[in-house]
Amino acid sequence: MYFARVLAAAALLVALPAAADFNDKKPINATVTGATPSGYPRTMVEGMNAVVRDTYPGSAVSFKPNSPGGGVLEIAEGRADFTATATGTEVRLANEGQSPYSKPLKGKFSYVMQLYDNQFIHFLMTKEWADANGIKSWADIASKKPRMRLAINRPDNPQTTIGAPYEVMKAYGFSINDIEKWGGSYVLGNSSIGLDAIVDDKADVFMNARNLGDALVKDVASKRPLLWIDGDRATIQKAADAFNFKADMVPVGTYPFMEKEYPTVRQWVALLAGSHVPDEVVYKYVKAMAENEKRVQAIGGSLKTSFTAAKMAVNPANLPYHPGALRYYKEKGLVK
């Protein structure tokens, strides 16, 4: 009987397929989306794709322009494999089918890696407008309801609208819709469009993401004096919690007009994959990034100051890992 059980167990082991070995140099094919046709996000994606192509010669890893919000839809519906600009905003809204998504996408995409966690939302106002309306803080805006021309992104770019400014407004007792009720208006577009509007006196307030110490913000401030909208860190944290972000303080001197620390929303940005993407493709993309840390950092921007292999498995939204990514992280002890 004992020998029969041993033989049966051995036969079962033979029958089970062994896990494929992905530790080879065979090429992979993938399309990465989520970045606009120009600017840093595209530079980031093109740089990461180049690392993968060099690690696995012959790979066809390409870039497909889109937006952060649109990128998640693309991978969920199988029109692209990865999106490289997702945050907690896109993850939650897509899972739940909230605007700008028309239906829940839960289960159609999964987590691959954190790319960086230092995307800071800039809450700026012109000194001229602030002085004219007696505004120093979010609380002042809530109580005085001033007419403002607000430069902000479009709501179909959720992370820099729904994911931060809208939530901070809610935390202080008003909403994005109140801006028009107070006699104000919007300049909708990316951060470059918004800063141009400040320079051209077409906007009074700017809410969007830029790197800390951004040269363009400094240049704008030299032409039209700026101030940071002050606030209470605990209240900002309440807003940040909605999408698994955190409140952080912008250090004194980050910009010439900052005489003290100011609170803001600090966001993380992640690479996601569609559920249709083979484990091998995801595993190899992850491995290429992890084992070429210095080269990834050399792409510049947020990757230079925040990307590390040790933090790739950090998953603030607790989105299920793609099996290919999870396999690599378990092999390296980054996930239990």
Predicted regions and their residues:
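Bilobed "Venus flytrap"/periplasmic-binding protein-like clamshell domains
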Residues: 27-55, 59-60, 119-121, 125-200, ...
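Bacterial N-terminal signal peptides that target proteins for export
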Residues: 1-7
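C-terminal lobe and pocket-closing loops
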Residues: 226-284, 320-321, 328, 332
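A structural signal for short loop-to-beta-strand junctions that line the ligand-binding cleft
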Residues: 102-122, 254-263
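N-terminal signal peptide c-region/cleavage motif recognized by signal peptidases
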Residues: 15-17
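Pocket-flanking alpha-helical
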Residues: 44-51, 62-106, 192-198, 206, ...
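An extracytoplasmic/periplasmic, membrane-proximal ligand-sensing/linker region
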Residues: 200, 205, 210-222, 228, ...
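Periplasmic solute-binding protein
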Residues: 115-131, 263-272
